[in-house]
């Protein structure tokens, strides 16, 4: 099959530092090539995926006609990351990575990131993100620190909750997150006792920090669509202390972490690592279906469905729509 991935934007595929969506599409392209398929990428000119033809497009938000002209005529199916304004000349699927606005509708060929994410938008179609395990290390000897890996400037990611948990546990917290902190947090956070702020990290520096961490703290207060940080931490041998929101119950099982919306309960988890084994956490990514090859195989099943019928579901299926009253930015409960 010839798959053309369309992902124009300000960041290349893969991104040098931050950019979960771009990194996932990088892993998907690699996996599709490994599985014997032909792949073309329409994306930022600095993009590169081994074995994939790049058709560069400099515009971050091009008109549909701009990228339509770049589609190879031999393409069987297009994989988009944004719903097109005008239908492209080939069968397509769209992966949506965020939460929709109340009442927002989506194209029938939309694929979400988890069962919970799909359900919040009136759909049953989803594929969990997968990563390339070879990019992550899992050290046998672990450091005495926890890691928070998220866009720390975003309230729903709850970095303050991570600080509370680690203070209760008496464990140092390393924060990997946004460099665009509000209120000059990037200046005063490193001065908080027991917290080290690394700003934006990627590649080997991030892998090194995760590979020796005790655990990953992920106390989000929203309906998390997926949470790449969770599988990155698990691949590195980190067990997970997180809230039970969004996709997290689909990813975190009792042998690799604990889910709770109470800081005191997560602090006990962070304080007592003996029940969790790094190799079990890493194997969970492989056995749980969270590798890039698992992801590619699931997407291939959807590609074949669209090629055969033109759509993911049945002709009379309702159009995916954000549930009435669903507010992605409303903070979910958290008990200090």
Language model: regions and residue ranges:
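N-terminal strand-loop element at the rim of the active site
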Residues: 10-15, 27-62, 182
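Nucleotide-sugar-dependent
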Residues: 14, 153-157, 221-227, 249-250
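A charged, aromatic-enriched C-terminal amphipathic alpha-helix characteristic of glycosyltransferases
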Residues: 61-62, 272-329
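Conserved donor-binding/catalytic core segment of Leloir-type glycosyltransferases
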Residues: 124-129, 134-176, 288
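Nucleotide-activated donor-binding/catalytic signature segment of Leloir-type glycosyltransferases, i.e.
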Residues: 185-201
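Short alpha-helical segment that forms part of, or immediately flanks, the ligand-binding pocket
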Residues: 207, 230-235, 249-250
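Short hydrophobic beta-strand element within catalytic cores of glycosyltransferases
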Residues: 238-242
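Conserved acidic donor-binding segment of nucleotide-sugar-dependent glycosyltransferases
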Residues: 253-264, 270-275
């Amino acid at each position: 099959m010839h798959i053309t991935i369309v992902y124009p934007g300000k960041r290349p595929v893969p991104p040098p530092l931050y950019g979960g969506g771009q990194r996932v599409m990088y892993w998907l392209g690699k996996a599709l090539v490994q599985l014997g398929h032909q792949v073309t990428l329409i994306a930022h000119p600095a993009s590169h995926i081994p074995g994939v033809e790049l058709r560069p497009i400099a515009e971050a938000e091009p008109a549909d006609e701009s990228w339509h002209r770049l589609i190879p005529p031999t393409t069987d199916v297009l994989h988009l990351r944004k719903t097109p304004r005008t239908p492209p000349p080939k069968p397509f699927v769209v992966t949506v990575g965020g939460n929709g606005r109340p009442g927002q509708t989506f194209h029938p060929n939309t694929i979400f990131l988890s069962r919970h994410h799909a359900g919040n938008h009136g759909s049953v179609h989803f594929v969990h993100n997968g990563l390339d395990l070879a990019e992550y290390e899992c050290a046998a000897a672990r450091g005495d620190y926890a890691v928070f890996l998220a866009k720390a400037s975003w309230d729903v990611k709850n970095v303050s909750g991570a600080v509370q948990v680690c203070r209760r546990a008496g464990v140092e917290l390393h924060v990997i997150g946004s460099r665009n902190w509000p209120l000059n947090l990037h200046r005063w956070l490193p001065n908080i006792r027991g917290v080290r702020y690394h700003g934006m990290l990627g590649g080997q520096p991030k892998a090194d920090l995760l590979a020796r961490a005790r655990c990953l703290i992920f106390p989000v207060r929203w309906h998390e669509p997926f949470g790449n940080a969770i599988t990155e931490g698990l691949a590195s041998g980190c067990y997970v202390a997180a809230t039970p929101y969004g996709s997290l119950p689909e990813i975190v099982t009792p042998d690799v972490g604990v889910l709770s919306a109470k800081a005191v309960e997560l602090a006990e988890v962070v304080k007592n690592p003996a029940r969790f084994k790094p190799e079990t956490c890493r194997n969970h990514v492989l056995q749980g279906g969270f590798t890039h090859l698992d992801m590619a195989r699931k997407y291939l099943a959807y590609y074949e469905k669209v090629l055969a019928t033109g759509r993911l579901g049945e002709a009379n299926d309702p159009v995916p729509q954000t549930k009435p009253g669903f507010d992605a930015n409303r903070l979910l409960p958290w008990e200090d």
